[in-house]
Amino acid sequence: MAKKTQADLNEVLPLSPAVFYILLALPDGPKHGYAIMKEVEEMTEGKITLGPGSLYGSIKRLLKDRMIAETDHRPARALDDERRRYYILTDYGRQVLAAEVDRLASAVRLAGQKAVYAGTI
């Protein structure tokens, strides 16, 4: 897939927190749904928990939008359940994730300039 322009990427931004954290769970390699769910919970120290409906609804949309893809890459058979589906981040998904990280970083910089941070509100 050709690299998208910033205007193309801005059409899908901002991402919902669920979609953002699902994408953020995948750059390290393939994961199945339950592993994504646990990684999101761990990354956010329990602040974001994805239920099955939210997780798999988001995965379905991410697959349709080609931000993630199913992969046949699996761990050793002894460690795996053949019913599991594994997902990877696509190049487009990586571009979208990077654009969202830039957008969020800009928002944090702006909040810092306005002296809006914990303890002042």
Which residues does each PLM region occupy?
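Short, Lys/Arg-enriched N-terminal segment that forms or immediately precedes the first helix
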Residues: 1-11
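Amphipathic alpha-helical dimerization/coiled-coil segments
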Residues: 3, 92-121
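N-terminal helix-turn-helix DNA-binding core of bacterial DNA-binding proteins
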Residues: 10-54
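Exposed loop/turn and edge beta-strand positions of beta-sandwich/beta-sheet ligand-binding modules
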Residues: 83
